[in-house]
Amino acid sequence: MKNDVISPEFDENGRPLRRIRSFVRRQGRLTKGQEHALENYWPVMGVEFSEDMLDFPALFGREAPVTLEIGFGMGASLVAMAKDRPEQDFLGIEVHSPGVGACLASAHEEGLSNLRVMCHDAVEVLHKMIPDNSLRMVQLFFPDPWHKARHNKRRIVQVPFAELVKSKLQLGGVFHMATDWEPYAEHMLEVMSSIDGYKNLSESNDYVPRPASRPVTKFEQRGHRLGHGVWDLMFERVK
């Protein structure tokens, strides 16, 4: 796995572009198990960043619906979903290598062949590597809420990002978000409702109950312990 996880973008003259990141790089120390997984399982399940569009049938060796998960943390819920839905393919993106190592170790232990992972900035991956109209679902669970008002612009869910996601979804594909921070849920709802071509799948036109397909994550468990609610939003691409 390459170490240049986050690559700068450049303009047409080769000058680097400054873009606000939605995450802070917290590399962390790899455990021996995570290091072993990165060394041994990355060559099979890892996908290096490039500026070439992915060919999903070639990547997975078959034609199947593809779900992209952005920011999978340690990968527990992503591995659980891939295990429960062997007829579907999953691509996970995470910027922190300990999480990637943990996910690879779990996926190997479960013997999964329908999961691939990347260690890179998801926005760059969407721009450079994900073909338009190719995804059945995009999942964004418990992204950093950037609580302070002056940091709200760092939240990943903004209009340009949601438009980018829509372009990568197939017609009928779904963008599924979840957060345990109510102001961020309200922000997500405002952003998504402002974009033409998305349909809110909530009967009350706001939030949906947690789908059975989404495993309860450690972040959700933490939220429950702290007395927080959890808000799921699901928006379908309709045009």
Curated annotation (Swiss-Prot):
Q: Which SUPFAM superfamilies match?
A: S-adenosyl-L-methionine-dependent methyltransferases
Cellular component GO terms held in the UniProt record: tRNA methyltransferase complex
Changing R150A: reported impact?
Answer: Reduces catalytic activity about 3-fold
- Keyword Ion transport assigned: no
PROSITE patterns linked to this entry: SAM_MT_TRMB (PS51625)
Keywords of the record, alphabetical order, are: Methyltransferase, S-adenosyl-L-methionine, Transferase, tRNA processing
Task: Read off the Pfam families from this record.
Answer: Methyltransf_4
GO terms for biological process, alphabetical = RNA (guanine-N7)-methylation; tRNA (guanine-N7)-methylation; tRNA methylation
Q: What is the effect of changing R155A?
A: Loss of activity
Altering D180A: what's the impact? Answer: Reduces catalytic activity over 10-fold
The EC number(s) given in the record are: 2.1.1.33
Residues the record lists as binding substrate: K148, D180, T217, K218, F219, E220
Could you tell me what reaction this enzyme catalyses? guanosine(46) in tRNA + S-adenosyl-L-methionine = N(7)-methylguanosine(46) in tRNA + S-adenosyl-L-homocysteine
Alphabetized GO MF terms: tRNA (guanine(46)-N7)-methyltransferase activity
Q: Which domain of life is it from?
A: Bacteria
Identify its protein family: Belongs to the class I-like SAM-binding methyltransferase superfamily. TrmB family.
PANTHER family to which the protein is assigned, alphabetical: 3-DEOXY-D-MANNO-OCTULOSONIC-ACID TRANSFERASE/TRNA GUANINE-N 7 - -METHYLTRANSFERASE, PENTACOTRIPEPTIDE-REPEAT REGION OF PRORP DOMAIN-CONTAINING PROTEIN
NCBIfam families (alphabetical): tRNA (guanosine(46)-N7)-methyltransferase TrmB
Q: What is the protein name stated in its UniProt record?
A: tRNA (guanine-N(7)-)-methyltransferase
What is the protein's species of origin? Escherichia coli (strain K12)
